[in-house]
Amino acid sequence: LTVRFRQRLKERLLGNLMVDLEMPLVPVLVSMELAGIGIDGDFFAEMRSKLIRELELIREDIFKLAGGDFNLNSTPQLRQVLFENLNLPIIKKTKTGPSTDGSVLEELAAKGHAVPRLMIDYRELEKLRSTYVDALPQLVHEETGRIHTSFNQTVAATGRLSSSDPNLQNIPIRTEIGREIRKGFVSQAGSV
């Protein structure tokens, strides 16, 4: 089997790439996976409290503007608030009724409607909270006290590395709060 694969690599002029680049990278990736990355648990706990407070303020603002409470995570309830209670224009429809997806909320917000803008903010903060701030501390290995990702050398067709379980290459950077989350990753004492 090895002989056949080597022959295929040579035929495709990939033999040197495999020997000179890909194979030497394997022990480096193994070392990185075993080392893991540290996080500051107190930082994430504080960040969680901050996000919960901000989410609550946004929730209160939405409820005031909407004229009452509703489940912000319920598409049918949001649809009712936006298109029936507030009588906002329907931008696009789905099989079940007017859409409340991100592009619709963006378009409505651009027209000056406050509830769609607040819903965008709410969804963004809620995703950051649930996907990163709440989830990452739960992934700390009991024995090492670090998060251990898997680096995937052969998944992306472009040859780029990818990361999974968790994907540590996907930590947000576009927003201020996204960048703040990155501050929760810490190096070992004496490593910087």
Residue ranges and their predicted role:
Residues K183-G184:
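Intrinsically disordered, low-complexity, charge-biased tails
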Residues L1-G178, S187-S191:
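Conserved "right-hand" nucleotidyltransferase catalytic core of DNA-directed polymerases
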